Amino acid sequence: PRNLSIAATEVGAKLVHVSTDYVFAGDGTRPYVEYDTPAPISAYGRSKYEGEKFVQQFANRYFIVRTAWLYGDGKNFVKTMLKLSETHDELFVVDDQVGSPTSAVELAKMIHFLEPTENYGLFHATCEGDTNWADFTEEIFKRAGIRTKVNHVTSEEYARMNPASAKRPAYSILEDFMLKLTTDYRMADWHDALDVYMKEMGY
């Protein structure tokens, strides 16, 4: 991010930097807004936050876009659950981690909207609404016509069953506050975005 920011400034280009909810501790009780102070608890989160600061320091015309629970092309949660359902009659999925599933297509649309403007700064961009991983899995299976049972477990229970699993933030809900405050653009509801994604995969 540092070198990109310097290069963008030297040639007068705009810079779009995509960041993450991991810059926050994940212990919130209300949706995080852009004015909330980051407090990353993982190496990944700290790295992303440092990247944001480099952009703010060295770039003149920038859009920092934080998103969460992203899925699209390549490996992602939706495809992982569909794959697991092929070999499992039941799955154990946490229900005490909450966030807003966000389609990469919807994120790209938002960036495409922002990029031609001079509305620079920091933005949160997640699909509207929120859920937990277990309920999200059930919505995926419902759309795919899959009958694999989803057992709801706590993060603590899941960690005991899968000691090597990475720790994730308990609370990942980002409020698209600046987007709503400064533009008339609205992200799609996560259910609708998931419908489109699943249909594109043939479900």
Regions found by a protein language model. Name each.
Residues 53-99, 105-106, 112:
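NAD(P)-dependent short-chain dehydrogenase/reductase
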Residues 64, 101, 130, 152, ...:
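Short aromatic/basic micro-patch
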Residues 93-98, 123-130, 182:
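Glycine-rich Rossmann NAD(P)(H)-binding loop
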Residues 10-11, 58, 144:
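Helix C-cap/helix->beta junction micro-motif
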Residues 14, 23-65:
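Catalytic helix-loop patch of NAD(P)-dependent Rossmann-fold dehydrogenases
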Residues 1-16:
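NAD(P)-cofactor binding segment of oxidoreductase domains
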Residues 132-138, 156-202:
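Conserved C-terminal active-site "lid" loop/helix of NAD(P)H-dependent oxidoreductases
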Residues 110, 117-164, 190:
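Mid/C-terminal beta-alpha module of Rossmann-like enzyme folds, strongest
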